[in-house]
């Protein structure tokens, strides 16, 4: 086990390296949205909307996709107000949990672009409805996979086929979650799909090297907004206890973190330092972001992550009697 002195020195090196990072040329990145067709699922709210605004300001042609056509059209008007002449800004209304609708949506978006595949695909669609597993219905379990995994997997599949058939390079960016690395009580209908999304992204990062298509994955923590508010309405008390002290960041800050990682050429992109130790403990052998910094984080994670896990498990045990009483009041038990 590392000595206290070693941990202190590691912490100093990590902090110093972190603040020096903006001045270090880690790797070349060809990320430049100017003039590119950027296709954003879940683009009518939250991270997707904030990202769309940033991309329009950088001169990109933007297509947003969402279920609510009226809401999406309203966002398009906002985007057009900040766009320059010649930028193509449009929306597509579609239920992306359907493979047919996903295919039709991306092809419709490409019509104004001579049917060429999008340059950048940002997969921001998804939702979270935390509940205890024993109180979750079978349909809710299925909805969790549909609304988190398949809603992105179908679009990613069609985008990969379009790009490769047309021999076009491009980028596909999955938006996963901190809960793609680690999970705990309350997220049994959500984190399995996020784990699956990370598995798909890892596989495609390797496979798409055959076609010169770049794959990235963004793993943020909580993002403030209507989606986060809806999540909290069903979130069990034990889950809130484990997350106590976590402050969600705004969609604008989150979008900035995503683009910062893309500009640095990172494969796995996070939005705060808290996620870094978890990323290094669970990265599945994918490329690191920076060898030196990641090595230091790995040392810290060898102590920090087990402590966090023990703390989380202790919190769950402390709720055992309370949950049992609540379930009993609902007539859950058979004896």
Curated annotation (Swiss-Prot):
Pathway: Lipid metabolism; sphingolipid metabolism. InterPro entries: KDSR-like, NAD(P)-bd_dom_sf, SDR_fam. It is a single-pass membrane protein. The chain crosses the membrane at residues 288-308. Residues 141-207 are annotated as: Involved in homodimer formation. NADP(+) binds at residues 190, 194, 223. PANTHER family: 3-KETODIHYDROSPHINGOSINE REDUCTASE. This is 3-ketodihydrosphingosine reductase TSC10. It comes from Cryptococcus neoformans var. neoformans serotype D (strain JEC21 / ATCC MYA-565).
